[in-house]
Amino acid sequence: MNTVPARNNGEKASARTVVLCADDYALHPLVDEAVEQLTLQGRLSATSCMTTSPHWRQAARRLPALRPRLSLGLHFNLTEGHGLQPAAGIGAVIARAYAGALGGAAMRDAWRRQLDAFEDALGMAPD
């Protein structure tokens, strides 16, 4: 994590921690490469993992080497189908959410599948 001085508005300055998180790990090999390089350069603190991606299991194999420098989270995906599942656009998902029409059981099932994929590949829960 990077520490930067706080803005000085006449008060004593204190250090603040800046956490930089890259979204969509496993979306595409180039995204993964950028996350890995930035982590090794000390410029990235965390990433969210897209476990619905067909590249997820392969990409996940490289993550243990980046620990503990890189915190890992789950990217709860409702909009990227990756050609494997039907997926609505973000606008449709937002509209359904506002209308209360997403369906609790379907959301729990999607969450559980994605969390299980994360834990199965990495042997740990998200940070």
Could you say what each language-model-derived stretch is?
Residues V18-H28, A97-R108:
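Active-site mouth loops of central-metabolism enzymes
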Residues N2-P29, V35:
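Boundary/entry segment of secreted carbohydrate-active catalytic domains
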Residues P29-H55:
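A short alpha/beta connector and helix-capping loop motif
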Residues A106-D127:
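CE4/NodB-like, metal-dependent polysaccharide N-deacetylase domain
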Residues V35-Q41, R57-G73, A88, E119-D120:
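Acidic (Asp/Glu)-rich catalytic clusters
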Residues T17-V19, L44-S48, R69-H75, P126-D127:
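Structural preference for beta-strand elements that scaffold enzyme active sites
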Residues D23-Y25, M50-T52, H75-G81:
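Active-site beta-loop-alpha junctions enriched in small/polar residues
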Residues G81-G103:
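Active-site gating loops and adjacent loop-to-helix segments of metal-dependent hydrolytic enzymes
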